[in-house]
Amino acid sequence: MWAKTTAFALILAAAAAAQDDEAKKKDEEAKAKIADFKKELKGAKNEKDISHAIEGLGELQHPRVLAELKGYLGRSAEEAVAAAEQIGKYKKDKDAADMLLGAAGARKDKDGIVKCLRYAGDTEFKGIVTKLTAYFRNKDTDIAKESVDSCAKVKSKDAIEPLLGLWKELDGIKEEKADKGGGLGVGGLGGGITGTGGVGASMQEEQLKRKRDLTPAVQSALNKITGEDFKDLRAANDWWRKNKGTFKDLE
């Protein structure tokens, strides 16, 4: 018995030593990769060259590399997008997902925000759903849509009710025909807008575009998260009322 215990202990010790050696090896690889990256930066003549160097750095996934990439999320749009794309490859990684959501909140340029949201979704880390759904009400339809699309990639049941709520708001935007006075009415997000043109008509078109762009995205996201095929909002709500207590995230 003692001999078996000793042998087992030796096996465990050997396995631990092997893991430690592998970790040290990867750490050295990361240091070398970062050193090569910095050398390449010295020869960079423009943002395109820098972005290319960032892509090369991202070929190796390691905490040291991730920390290096983080520093570029606050740079120019092109550099930030290049870094965000590489960070998005860190699947199920909380730090990577949080970095991208933090960058999305800090940036002022639309493309940078959209891409950070997109690559945050690529991490598939479920802990970011609450932050993603906060973008549903963003006035910019493209930003709102990207947050919906990212929820579809994360596939967390925590996104279902916010998505249903958004669908309800969008469903409330009515595509009404012109009334006798030539005006058009719109409900939902900005309801009660009427008029013969000008600002009212412009706001109406904006809301209708939002509805047309976001509704298919919301429907698709709900289908991917639940594995169902909802044809309309009523069907989705009915299903959720019946399954809310037992539904678990799909693998």
Predicted regions located by residue number:
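Bacterial N-terminal signal peptides that target proteins for export
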Residues: M1-A7
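N-terminal leader/linker segments that initiate helical-solenoid repeat arrays
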Residues: A18-P63, E78, G198
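Amphipathic alpha-helical scaffolding segments comprising HEAT/armadillo-like alpha-solenoid repeats
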Residues: D27-E40, H62-G74, V81, K92-A106, ...
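Positions within the helices of HEAT/ARM-like alpha-solenoid repeats
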Residues: K45-I50, S76-V81, K108-I113, I128, ...
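Extended alpha-helical scaffolding segments
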Residues: S150-A235, W239-T246
